[in-house]
Amino acid sequence: SRVSMECNRESIEKIKELYSHYLKNPSISTDSRSIKKGDIFFALKGDNFDGNNFVFQAIEQGASLVVCDNKQIEKGDKILLCENSLTMLQNLATYHRKQLKTTIIGISGTNGKTTTKELIQVVLSKKFKTLATKGNLNNHIGVPLTLLSIPCDTEIAIVEMGANHVGEIGFLCDIAMPDLAILTNIGTAHIEGFGSRENIIKTKKELFDFVKNNSCEKSHIFVNFDDEALKDETFSKKTTYSLNTKADISAKACCENGYAQIIYKDNLIASNLVGVYNAYNILAALTIGLHFGVELEQIKKAIEQYTPSNNRSQILKTNNNTLILDCYNANPSSCTSSIESFANMEANHKMVFMGAMKELGEVS
């Protein structure tokens, strides 16, 4: 595994030492401005900042330990010097993951992953103690932070994984070690970093590949049977779902005044999500809920009570207008879906405000 590959003996000892400290103070910070008493502060480097410059400020603010990688910093009781703070964060997260009995569901895809993640959590929390990625902390820093926020008594965690270059999902899987996986769909986001649609497909499928290659009793994949790039995925433990054709879990999409709904076995499941494209996100959450034995009535209740609050399919009413906020992120496929859905809504005067889309490379 990645941890043993990247660690010499000294590093493994440091991780164990760090882990015993983490168990007493299981709160991690990478931002010196928002440190709480007892936090472990990881001094990370970014394009415009270097956390090593804030080591002593972090201690003054109450950090119980600082992990840093600038050799100029003098050793102290609260300072753990290592080769690379980011690698140490990732390795600590993997070490914690290995101690957990928590079932981990990995989620990725071009569109809908954050909404689907939120829906899966509200559904599963009807029966289990759950945790899900906060916001979209889904990269090489966010995934370790998510793992390190999982208490030992968590039964199921839903970990979101994003990527903008080949190999990134595989790397995140090595850290999070998901037992189950779902890919919402495959579109054309971040194509600049991937180089081609084929590379996007290959990278997203690294999530399925990890689960298949590390098969255990819990292993399972959930396949969007309506997605051309995903429908032929083979694995002995898989569940397919579809809005258009016969699958393990089949439903029909409908829209009531702009809000996504699905009909499953004569049961109408409504939502507070604008846009018929959200029907897939609802169906994915239903499929996973059924897999884990959540009763249909509870699944329906969870989805119908969920209200988005993160500029994704969110509705705000003012005195004069109804605003639909779907502006957290954008790519050509998600934008097309949003506009088609908006076109089908009944309203006298409609207006669209669009921003730019970046990282599209050749297809700009």
Model-derived regions, located:
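N-terminal leader/targeting and accessory segments in enzymes
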Residues: S1-N91, Y95, V274, A343-A347
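Active-site beta-alpha connecting loops in nucleotide-dependent enzymes
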Residues: L44-F49, S309-N311, C327-S364
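Short amphipathic alpha-helices and their capping/turn segments at secondary-structure boundaries
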Residues: V55, E60, H165, I169-I175, ...
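Phosphate-binding loop of NTP-binding sites
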Residues: M88-I221, F225, A229-K237, G289-L290
